[in-house]
Amino acid sequence: LGLCCILSGIMVYVPFLRYSYMEQMIVIFTEYKPIVSPDHAYEFLGDIGAAYGTITMITYLFGGLIADKFREKNLLLAGSILMGLSSIWYGTVPGKTGLILIHVFYAIGTGILIWSAFLKVTRKMGTSKEQGRMFSISEMARSILNMLIGFLGVAMLGRAVIGDGSMDPQV
């Protein structure tokens, strides 16, 4: 359960980094590696979110079918690899098309591979009478892990902020 919660917590957190770190991402995409003009930066981040949301909504339709046909362990592993490789690519700050593709891969990883398998694993952990407790425990563990990941992100961001309030993306 612990590994599944870590995976599902990160899976939910990473595609939505733009909500927590919007201003920092604007600096990176307009100053550090200018791939979009400052006038269109917010629109670009919205386009990334729209690509992710649209594809995820479509992939959820197939996630349950895929989870019933393949072993959960294999789906979680494939989703982890896809999300990990996409996140490494994201860290290199590719161009516009690359960032949109990364979010399409995130949508496939979360919607088809990870989320349905995670729900199936959680459901299998207890009897029908224990389902409420199993899902409550998994949500609690996911929330605690998301909080810790958020603190780690803020700590890393704190190291990148210079004393005058500006950013040093090289850190």
PLM feature spans:
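Membrane-interface helix caps of multi-pass secondary transporters
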Residues: 17-39, 122
